[in-house]
A protein has these predicted regions:
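First transmembrane helix
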Residues: 28-57, 74, 208-214
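Seventh transmembrane helix
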Residues: 242-248, 252-254, 276-326
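Hydrophobic alpha-helical transmembrane segments
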Residues: 67, 119, 147-152, 196-197, ...
Length: 326
């Protein structure tokens, strides 16, 4: 219940005494649906356009393009879950049934871990191509079958990381109100494992990989004078920086909740502060889904031209004067 537990505050606050639960719930009912709706609309349009560009104009057997496509696909899966969480926050009751509780949790987690793993893969692919150009590992995967198999493996990893929480998600009836939550077996270590997994796979592993790879890539690019290569690495670095700026606060709060689970910070004030903080940092983290398309549009000239080319095909009267040649 790390990312949904503020929906069932009534079940949690009694452990440590009363605190101002109503103020947190009122804030959730007003703030979360509006923010989730904005993120969903902006993110779905942007990532949908990215997917269209990559399918229509790019070679999906190319590993870089395949990573970008699956990154957009991960964001789309993540975004599809937001209308359900928005409704859940607004009415404080889950009305979609047990199957959808599992399904929406799966979309959320697959999108989250998919984004991480494909960003890691994209980083390793660029590192191999630049630092080890003579023995480029991914050159052997530049076929539709091989690259698709590697992408499928990333999705299997995402499913493996998500599966425990998908299995343990369930609909419970509390005081005649249905709630979708993750309930771990009594006496098990699954909840602790979930917190640790989220911090390790969500921040520590990707940060370590990216620091290692880009600390070796950047010096090589500093010696080059090819503008296109500079722009390509700039786009990837910006993607990574944005990802960590938006997800680090969330991981910090998750770590604090893990400490609370171990018996630290047990006061009612800490309980309320963490619930309120989770809403803010989780919404910030959700917003990263909107940013990848914006980065492509403003950093990559090629993507900007291809965006406009697609828009010209769909809306010729509006965009005929906007398309420029590369």
């Amino acid at each position: 219940d790390d990312y949904k537990d503020y929906y069932d505050l009534d079940q949690n606050h009694s452990r440590h005494g009363l605190y101002n639960v109503n103020s947190v719930k009122t804030f959730s009912k007003v703030f979360l649906p509006a923010l989730y709706s904005i993120v969903f609309i902006v993110g779905f349009i942007g990532n949908g356009l990215v997917s269209c560009v990559l399918v229509k104009f790019h070679n999906t057997s190319n590993m870089s393009d395949l990573c970008l496509f699956n990154l957009a696909l991960s964001d789309l899966l993540f975004l599809i879950s937001l209308p359900f969480w928005a409704h859940y926050a607004a009415v404080t009751e889950w009305i979609f049934g047990s199957f959808m509780c599992h399904a929406v949790t799966a979309l959320y987690l697959l999108g989250f871990y998919g984004s991480i793993f494909f960003m890691i893969l994209m980083t390793i692919e660029r590192y191999s191509a630049i630092v080890h150009a003579n023995t480029f590992l991914f050159s052997k995967y530049n076929s539709v079958k091989s690259s698709s198999a590697l992408a499928l493996f990333m999705w299997v990893l995402s499913l493996g990381a998500s599966l425990p929480n998908i299995i343990f998600s369930q609909v419970k009836n509390e005081s005649n109100v249905s709630i979708c939550m993750i309930e771990y077996p009594q006496g098990s270590s699954w909840k602790s494992f979930s917190y640790i997994e989220l911090n390790i796979l969500g921040l520590i592993v990707p940060l370590s990989v990216m620091v290692f790879c880009y600390s070796r890539v950047i010096p090589i690019f500093m010696t080059l004078k090819t503008e296109k290569k500079h722009k390509a690495v700039k786009r990837i670095v910006v993607l990574i920086i944005v990802f960590f700026l938006f997800w680090t606060p969330y991981n910090i709060v998750i770590f604090l909740k893990f400490l609370q689970h171990l018996g630290y910070m047990q006061s009612s004030q800490w309980e309320q502060n963490l619930h309120m903080a989770m809403q803010w940092v989780e919404t910030i983290a959700f917003s990263h889904c909107c940013l990848n398309p914006i980065i492509y549009a403003f950093v990559g000239q090629k993507f900007r031209n291809l965006f406009l080319k697609i828009l010209k095909e769909w809306f010729p009267l509006c965009f005929d004067q906007c398309v420029t040649t590369e």
